[in-house]
Amino acid sequence: MKILIGAPVRQSEEVFKEYLKSLDNLEKPCQVDRFFYLHNSPKLAEYLEPNEYANATTKEEYKKDENTHYWKSVNLQVVTCLKNELIKRTLEGGYDYFMLVDSDLMLHPKTLITLLEADKPIVAEVFWTKWQPDEEPTPNAWDLDHFTFYQDSIDKWKNPGLYKVGGTGACILIHRSVFEAGVNYSPLYNVSFWGEDRSFSIRATAHNYELWLDTHYPAVHLYRESEYQKYVENGGYEAAFS
């Protein structure tokens, strides 16, 4: 068995180094390779081996600040294309699984093993995000539609377990059979929901795949620069997952 870990990456050097540290420290039961599309981020190449990345250069702007990240349709189009290229690389490379991990997520060492032990074609690890500074954190999963929850889901997902969900993404382990069935991140022409993870989730369920969320080892989401600074001040990776 072999696994490919990867993502499109448009990230600061500081956060990317912490991200790589968390990937390096994953418990790995088999061959695990990694590959990243460095999206307008050529400086990050110095932290990778030559066979671990390709540069992806585009002209569109992407803005983020302490409030939120400002996504435009063109940003989503690029990310969708790069995620689909990672699917192609998974299939052509003979990998059994692809694990997508967004580049601002810090993973517990047992994340990969736990997701494999779930024995599901599609299973994600939970993380919680304040999309606006004054909001309550919400998870990287939902029950219905764009981002709708059943009444008890938020409280339920705070407890360690494995839960069937309606959609998920960003930190997700996917078996190659899902891709062989034709599931990908491309938008659906008759669905207006925003985001490639929603397109993937809808395509997966249309192909009779269930989506699962593991909550045993929540990832840490460094969504803002201030959250990265707090993470470092509190002891970084070692303190977060000791």
Q: Where do the protein language model's features map onto the residues?
A:
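Active-site beta-to-alpha loop of glycosyltransferases that engages the nucleotide-sugar donor
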Residues: 7-21, 40-41
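Conserved catalytic core of nucleotide-sugar-dependent glycosyltransferases
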Residues: 87, 108-188
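Hydrophobic targeting segments
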Residues: 2-7, 23, 33-37
